[in-house]
Amino acid sequence: MPVRAQRIQHVMQDTIINFYSTSDDYGDFSNFAARPIKVDGNTWPTSEHYFQAQKFLDEKYREEIRRVSSPMVAARMGRNRSKPLRKNWESVKEQVMRKALRAKFEQHAELRVLLLATAPAKLVEHTENDAYWGDGGNGKGKNRLGYLLMELREQLAIEK
């Protein structure tokens, strides 16, 4: 690789792309982005709707979540502990998120192109509201959503 290309590659590796709000430049990476996905025969208004609904075994409640007007309401319903969570939720939640993300980026070609164009930058869901899926606002969170997006980006690049 020529020296200049190596320098550009190095600069991109040091680049961090933050996302959180759907109005950000990379807001479509947010699970709240209005990008419907079709999974298991159902169309979900957002990946957030799908993800939150999968926390529950109660089909009626899952359908209620699917039909709510906004991802914010879906997220609130996902935190409802008067409804029992799946017993295995903690062990399957990342698989569920992977499935939602793959559906979103496979079903929306322009998002796939955008995601691939970010390589090899680090993707960070930058928010104080979540230290598991996001960075906790201070960089100390796990940023699992960012890592799953980078993992998907690698897979899509190979499949391209």
Swiss-Prot record:
UniProt cross-references to InterPro entries, sorted A to Z: NADAR, YbiA-like_sf
Lineage, top ranks: Bacteria, Pseudomonadati, Pseudomonadota, Gammaproteobacteria, Enterobacterales
Protein known as: N-glycosidase YbiA
Source organism (scientific name): Shigella flexneri
Keyword presence, Ribonucleoprotein: no
SUPFAM superfamilies recorded: YbiA-like
The keyword Manganese appears for this protein: no
One MF term in the entry's GO annotations: hydrolase activity, acting on glycosyl bonds
Role of this protein: Catalyzes the hydrolysis of the N-glycosidic bond in the first two intermediates of riboflavin biosynthesis, which are highly reactive metabolites, yielding relatively innocuous products. Thus, can divert a surplus of harmful intermediates into relatively harmless products and pre-empt the damage these intermediates would otherwise do. Helps maintain flavin levels. May act on other substrates in vivo. Has no activity against GTP, nucleoside monophosphates or ADP-ribose. Is Required for swarming motility.
Protein keywords: Glycosidase, Hydrolase
Root EC class: hydrolase
Reactions accelerated catalytically: 2,5-diamino-6-hydroxy-4-(5-phosphoribosylamino)-pyrimidine + H2O = 2,5,6-triamino-4-hydroxypyrimidine + D-ribose 5-phosphate; 5-amino-6-(5-phospho-D-ribosylamino)uracil + H2O = 5,6-diaminouracil + D-ribose 5-phosphate
Pfam family, one: NADAR
